[in-house]
């Protein structure tokens, strides 16, 4: 099915969506969920990712730029190089890895690995043209930071805590709060606070001390390119 709409008319569009349309929309929805913790955005991101997989995926790895039923084309292409905008396969790789963390779904990670495999030879030969793909690869290789904000008594407490967490540069950080997202399940407020911070498989005790969590987020891997 097609998910492309025209704004501000809010009607379905007759145009066929491309991989760009899906990848950028999913990226925005995941970020919107992590900013508002409204589970409908997470669910919509997951639904659109399922649609993208069905319409664009190549089982050999990566995504074609046009949908599988675009019959008027002589050939379908897969693009991996960044242009004026980040490449949509690279954006998709990071989307899939973020969904893997939030949904605890290995299929998302497997799709991301397929993108890396399909683009690896080109990435090694032309790394400067793969900035967004390298961002996604760094996310995959870095031990992940996961912050779960258990619902507290104040309605906007989770949103305020998330805004504070984003004051630190932590590119592998994923944030979840509320019901309906597997990463946030089984995380009730503790006696000492409502904020859980985990790196890899090790978690700090729940705390209300945002500054302590911000200090922990300073432990970010730094990479230096050889001259």
Locate predicted features.
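Glycan-recognition and catalytic cores of secretory/periplasmic carbohydrate-active enzymes
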Residues: 6, 10-227
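Short, well-ordered junction/capping motifs at the entry into regular secondary structure
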Residues: 1-2
């Amino acid at each position: 099915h097609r998910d492309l709409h025209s704004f501000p008319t809010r009607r379905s569009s007759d145009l066929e969506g491309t991989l760009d349309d899906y990848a950028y929309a999913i990226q925005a929805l995941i970020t919107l969920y992590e900013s508002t913790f409204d589970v409908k955005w997470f669910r919509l991101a997951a639904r659109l990712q399922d649609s993208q997989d069905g319409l664009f995926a190549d089982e050999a790895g990566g995504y074609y730029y046009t949908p599988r039923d675009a019959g008027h084309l002589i050939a379908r292409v897969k693009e991996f190089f960044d242009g004026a905008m980040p490449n949509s396969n690279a954006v998709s790789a990071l989307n899939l890895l973020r969904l893997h963390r939030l949904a605890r779904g290995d299929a998302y990670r497997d799709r991301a690995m397929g993108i890396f495999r399909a683009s690896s030879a080109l990435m090694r030969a032309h790394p400067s043209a793969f900035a967004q793909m390298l961002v996604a690869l760094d996310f995959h290789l870095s031990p992940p930071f996961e912050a779960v904000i258990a619902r507290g008594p104040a309605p906007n407490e989770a949103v305020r805590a998330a805004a504070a967490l984003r004051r630190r540069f932590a590119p592998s950080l994923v944030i979840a709060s509320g019901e309906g997202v597997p990463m946030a399940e089984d995380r009730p407020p503790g006696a000492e606070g409502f904020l859980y911070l985990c790196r890899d498989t090790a978690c700090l005790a729940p705390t209300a001390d945002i500054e302590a969590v911000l200090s922990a987020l300073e432990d970010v891997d730094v990479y230096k390119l050889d001259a």
